[in-house]
Amino acid sequence: MELLVFVSSTCAHCPKAEQVVRIVCPEYSEYGLTYEKVRTRSQRGSELSEKYMVMSVPTLIFLNDKGIEINRIIGVPSEIGLRNKIEILLGIKETFLKKIFGNKKKWTKLIY
């Protein structure tokens, strides 16, 4: 999984978002998480911003192994919030509803 961190040099909140990513993401490198800082005013940044329809910065976009967007965060995430999101997307942590209701297939069998 890859995390693209869209930032701009004129953005007041982007340095904080970058700091949170630099602190949290290395903890998940053993799970295959990589991250890349994307400057929206660069050639590549402009192309990626258009491709993923980034309208504001900071924006964090999670991509699966095929490069398809699976989630995004707009704004500055907290360290805890980013950890939770990463763990859910990597399958390390179950969502609250999954903890309560369990596997959807199991419930489907009970209902029908």
Regions inferred by a protein language model and the residue ranges of each:
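Non-globular targeting/processing and membrane-anchoring segments
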Residues: 1, 15-16, 22-23, 50-56, ...
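Hydrophobic beta-strand anchors of alpha/beta hydrolase catalytic cores
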Residues: 3-4, 60
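Thiol-based oxidoreductase modules, predominantly thioredoxin-like and allied folds used
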Residues: 6, 30-45
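Conserved redox-active cysteine motifs that mediate thiol-disulfide chemistry
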Residues: 6-20
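Conserved residues at beta->alpha junctions
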Residues: 8, 39, 73, 77
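Short helix-loop-beta junction
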Residues: 23-31
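A broad, structure-centric signal for solvent-exposed, well-ordered loop/edge residues
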Residues: 45-47, 61, 80
